[in-house]
Amino acid sequence: MNFLSSLFKSGKAERLKQRVHAVERENERLRSIITLDQAHRARWHDLEATLDRTAIEASVTSALANAEFDDRPMPHLVLRNLLPAATYAALLEAIPPDDFFPDHDPVKQNVKLRQLEMAPAWTRRALEFLENTVIPGILTPALLARMRPYLDNATAARPHAATAGRLMLRRPGYKLEPHLDPSRVALTCLLYFARPGDDTAHGTQLFSIDRPITVDRTNTFYPRQHGYTCKRVKIIAFEPNTALVFLNRGGAHAAEIPKKAPKHTRRFAYQFYVAPEEAAVESLVSP
């Protein structure tokens, strides 16, 4: 047996290929950090100015006052012009390049800020502000105040908190069947990070369920797998600076980007949950 045959049969070649790929990705991330940090350094003062809590609170208050509410298929809100335009643009700039997203799944990729070993300075600064100030200090209290009447009495009486969220990247070929999030979740919140020119069709689909769910759904629950019938009621368009917030019961949600969509299609959104405090704390320490 020659050297190459031995190498391939032992699996060493595949492991070597994986290591080379990992090194190439790390080098690409380092190059991106250097390039982006240099570009942002000259504009840092202007970028920081967009993280204005007072302006963001006013914008969220206005978005809530003008929000589209519907109780079909489950109580939900669509908030448009959620953030000041400059803040939204600065958050779009904070989305890291693709190499910062895990690549084990080519169509479904998630990033949690606390899991990033390296990131551009503005990515870390802006997403930390989103996670540590905007979501827990502005959005969560406002959304709870608006949606609390639709929570059951036992849940509504408990203190709630936001879970640590995730930045999501989806590509053509992605398909998520109608489902409900884990039962500990009271509200599911999606912040659309649509960029200029993104196809609005790749939004969130809301489904009715033919009867009340009577089986355990501690984990993510797919009604069709348990004999329930789901019927699509509407699609919340993937529009810039828009948030979708819905009650995690009574209906299901899904999403899809068809394989035939243009290859360059990318759908960015930030998802977080609002849950009773003990459940939210558990999510903070889970991977």
Briefly describe each language-model feature range.
Residues 66-147:
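Non-heme Fe(II)/2-oxoglutarate
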Residues 22, 26-33, 123-144, 218-229:
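N-terminal short leaders/motifs
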Residues 36, 46-48, 52, 91-92, ...:
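Short, Φ-rich (hydrophobic/aromatic) sequence segments
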Residues 1-69:
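Fe(II)/2-oxoglutarate
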